[in-house]
Structure formats: C-alpha cells, structure tokens
From Swiss-Prot:
It comes from Arabidopsis thaliana (Mouse-ear cress). InterPro entries: Cas1_AcylTrans_dom. It is an enzyme of class 2 (transferase). This is Protein REDUCED WALL ACETYLATION 4. The lineage of its organism: Eukaryota, Viridiplantae, Streptophyta, Embryophyta, Tracheophyta. It is found in: Golgi apparatus membrane. GO terms for cellular component: Golgi apparatus; Golgi membrane. Belongs to the PC-esterase family. CASD1 subfamily.
Length: 540
C-alpha cells in the first residue's frame, strides 16, 4: 500500500485519539459479553447507534435501558465532571466503559469510517478510473430511479398545517425533503459522469439548497423563537462536525467542501437577522427593516469592489483555498465565487417563509371556492408560471456557463418559484411525495462530503475529484453499483453517528455543561495535535 502524501500532525493526532477509543470500545464489548454470560442473560442491541443508560449496582442488580434512536447520553456521563470521566476512560474503568459502551461504539465507528476515507482516497490500495459521460445513460438512470421511486415509495400525507389547522400542506417537510433528494441525485450524477452540459441546472439546484437554508431557518426561529446557545451549537455541529474531521484526515482546506461554509455563513446570517431584537419580530415593519438590512449587507459585501477581500482576508486561513490545478488564483477566489453566486437567494427564502402563513390562508380560501373559479385561478397560475419558466429557460438558462454565472445571483429565484408554484398547484400534488427521494434528502450533507473520497477520487490534498473510485476494474457499471451501495450506506451511518454524538456532547438545557464540553474538546484536540507534531519532528 503506497501513501500518496506525507503524514501530517493532524492525521497523527487523529490516530492518537481514535486508537484508544477503539481499544476502549472493544474492551467494553468484552466486559458486556462477560457480564451477560455471567448472569446468563442476553441483551439484544436494537440499533448500533443507540445510547444506553446503564446503572451498575452490585447490591440491586443491573438495569440496561435501550431503544430507538439515541436522544440523550447516560445520566452518569452528564452528571460526572469531565475530568473524572477522562480519568475513568484512561484507566479503562469497567463501570464507565459499560455505562458508555454505545457512545464508545459510535465514536469508534466514526473513526473507522474516516480511516476508510483515507484508504480510498490517499492510498493505492483501491484503484481509480476515468469518468465517462453518456447522455443516454445519465437520463436513463435518473428516469429509472424516478419510476422505481414512484412504484415503491409514493406516499400520501395527511399532516395538518400548524398555521391553519387544515391539510393545505404548502411547502411541507415531506415535499422539501423530496425536493432536496432528487436535486442531490442529479448533483451527484453530474459529478460522477462529468455531465458538464447540466452545469447551469446544477447552479440552480445549489441555489435551491441555499433557498431552503433561508426558508427553513427563518421558519424555525420565527415560530419557535429558540435562539439558545444549545440550538446554535447543534446547528454548527450538524454543518461542520463531519467536514472538520475530513479536513484533518485528508489534509484538505475547508473550502474544498464549499457547500459547508456557504450554508454556515447563510445560517449565521439568518440567525443574526432574527436573533437581534427578536422580541420585535412580530412587527411587520421591523421584519421589513431586517430583510432590507440583509439586502444592504449583501450589496455592500459583494457588489462593491474590494469590500469582500477586506472583510474576509483575516479569515483566509479558514476560507482560503488553492486548487493544485490552478495554483495562481488568489486564496479567497473560490470563497468569493461560490458565496457570491447565491448571495441573494437565502433572503428570498426568508421572504417566502415570512409570507408562508399568508399564502396558506390564500390557498385555503382557494380550495373553498366553487369548482369553476378554483379551476380558472389554478389554470392561470400554472400558465403564468410555465410562461415565466419558459422565458427564463430561453433567455437565461441557455447561456454559456460564464455568462450564465453573471446572471445567476439575480435570476435563480425564477426557476425556484416556478417549481414551487407547479409543485403546489393542486391539493393532490401537495399530499403526495416520493419517500425514497425524501429519505435521500435527509442525508444530503453526508452524501455531498463523502462523494469526494469513497465514490470519486482526487488522490491529493485539495484536489478536485476528477477520477472515479474503482473497486471492480474493467466493469464500470458493476463498479458503479458496488461503490454507490457502499457510499450510500456509509452516508446513512454518518448521518446517524453525527446525531448520536451530538446528543452526547451537546446538552440541550445545560449551557454550563455545554461550555465545559467545548473547552474540554478544544483542550484535548490541542494536546493531541502537539503530541502528533512532536512525534513527526523526532525523526528529524
């Protein structure tokens, strides 16, 4: 096995952390097996990622509580000081390992997956092959997936709107997850097959994701009014926990996975817009002022030459990126380009979320109209939307990619709005969704990041994934089938593990404990990095 790049301190520090975790987990499994054998009692694990609450009382017996997806860590883990937990871990105390066996299992599995990433993308153990595009095959595979999804996962929903109390279901969760799912499939196939002719469509899909960032976060904060530190930390964990480890293990810049910093930025901007003077959010004029302020910030940042570079240059260490194939570009070029393409659409998402209750009430009244009037209004909406979509397609979408990118920030709302209108024009369309796509829509972040290393291949730090991972050489379709199956399975596990570990390390109602956890994780990471750096310097 040949390693393609020198080992970094970050990679050594990761191994220093993950190897003891794996040993501790294996030992905890042995302890559980020995205890179960001793008591002649078998405990079944319903889910490998569940968090177990174990209280080991020698005089009173043993109680093991398991079930479903994990929601909280063991009570002893939360109640014990971090220093005590760390000492108990390092000394391999039996009771501690048994109490936190499922947590150790989740951490060990997460580490093993990251090692698999490294093996696939940074060693010669698994081969690589060239991309090959066929429009016929590309469209065939996507249409086949739609047919299979429609035949096996079409589901009718009867959820009621929290606003109107009726089954209007305008832009409901099932629908937006489905939307993310089919866009993600095309986005991934675009990368796998190098389907460059769909470049402009992919730009619209990414705008759709950013639109949902504005729409979803605005809806949550406006309705729930939860601006707590725990909620904020949970968001940042969801967006950046996995990608941070990928940057360490693969020695990549954060901006290689540009979707993550983009969504982080626009999530922060929505959080700031609604969190500042949040007690006045119910006042329409205040909300109008906030949205106008968002537009003003974007105009100042992206439309006035030089401002972007001045503002972001102090963060070039985090947001800078150098493509090995284009080393002469400025470090902030990629961040400027990517964030600038979708600089307005998140605000459009906020506006649509703000008027969502109003539109639902309009739709409720429309459904109560007589059939003739209802049909004429819906026909008009479909006609106007289709005509607007046609004009956009003819005069914007058909432009070459360079010219299209200039218009994209100002026009991406058009196809998104057209899709929303057509997808929600009838009650029947709103009630049904393809749950296969909705399921895929829930793991878009994991599939986006994982594709770089276990589906595609770049082989070098910060390299774009120009190659395909090849487990079965000379059989491209069989290889596609196998690598895709592994890739999706790993993405699902990463989604579950990220949520599992989030529930362990981010308490929802204890900010003091949360702060202690953050400080402890930072201190442990720093110590491991220093040790890794020293170990690499010793040979020299």
């Amino acid at each position: 096995m040949v390693v393609s790049q020198p080992i970094t301190p970050g990679q050594v520090s990761f191994l220093l952390g993950v190897i003891p975790l794996m040993i501790a987990w294996l030992y905890s499994e042995f302890l559980e097996y020995r205890r179960s054998s001793f008591h002649a009692k078998v405990h079944s694990d319903k889910n490998l990622v569940e968090l177990e609450m174990v209280t080991n009382k020698e005089d009173e017996g043993t109680v093991l509580m398991e079930g479903g997806l994990p929601r909280s860590a063991s009570s002893k883990f939360y109640s014990s000081p971090i220093k005590t937990n760390l000492i108990r871990f390092l000394t391999l105390e039996d009771s501690f390992l048994l109490e936190n066996r499922a947590t150790l299992r989740a951490m060990a599995e997460f580490g093993a997956i990251l090692l698999y990433f490294y093996i696939c993308d940074r060693t010669s153990l698994i081969g690589q092959s060239q991309k090959n595009y066929s429009r016929d095959l590309f469209l065939f595979l996507f249409c086949l997936l739609i047919i299979v999804s429609a035949m096996t996962s079409l589901k009718k929903h009867t959820d009621k709107s929290p606003i109107t109390g009726k089954s209007i279901l305008y832009l409901n969760r099932h629908q937006t997850e489905e939307w993310k799912g089919w866009m993600q499939v095309l986005f991934l196939m675009y990368h796998y097959f190098a389907a460059v002719e769909f470049y402009n469509a992919i730009r619209v899909f990414i705008a759709g994701y950013v639109w949902m960032t504005g729409f979803g976060n605005f809806s949550y904060y406006y309705i729930r009014k939860d601006f707590s530190l725990a909620r904020f930390t949970q968001m940042m964990w969801r967006l950046n926990f996995f990608v941070a480890f990928c940057c360490i293990i693969l020695n990549n810049d954060y901006m290689l996975y540009y979707i993550c910093p983009m969504h982080t930025l626009f999530t922060l901007m929505v959080y700031g817009a609604l969190g500042i003077y949040s007690q006045y959010n119910e006042i329409a004029s205040v909300m109008a002022l906030k949205i106008a302020s968002c537009f003003l910030v974007v105009i100042l940042m992206w439309e006035i030459p030089g401002v972007f570079e001045i503002f972001w240059s102090p963060l070039a260490f985090l947001l800078g990126y150098t493509d090995p194939a284009k080393p002469d570009l400025p470090r902030l070029h990629e961040w400027h380009f990517r964030s600038g393409l979708d600089r307005y659409i998140w605000i459009i998402g906020m506006i649509y979320a703000y008027f969502h209750p109003t539109v639902e009430r309009w739709m409720e009244k429309l459904e109560e109209c007589d059939a003739k009037r209802r049909m004429s209004i819906k026909t008009s909406i479909i006609g106007i939307s289709s005509f607007a979509g046609y004009l956009w397609y003819e005069y914007i979408y058909k432009l070459d990619k360079v010219t299209y990118n200039k218009y994209h920030p100002y026009t991406s709302w058009i196809p998104i709005t057209v899709y929303i209108c057509l997808r929600n024009c009838t009650q029947q369309l709103r009630r049904f969704s393809l749950t296969l796509f909705a399921w895929l829509g829930k793991i878009t972040l994991e599939t986006y990041i994982s594709q770089f290393h276990i589906w595609l291949r770049s082989s070098v730090p910060n390299g774009q994934p120009k190659l395909l991972l090849s487990i079965i050489p000379e059989y491209p379709m069989l290889n596609f089938m196998l690598t895709t199956a592994i890739y999706v399975l790993v993405s699902v596990r990463l989604f579950e593990l990220t949520n599992t570990l989030k529930s362990v390390f981010i308490p929802t109602k204890d900010d003091k404990r949360l702060l202690h956890n953050v400080i402890a994780m930072a201190a442990i990471s720093f110590c491991l990095y220093i040790i890794g750096l020293i170990l690499l310097l010793i040979p020299h």
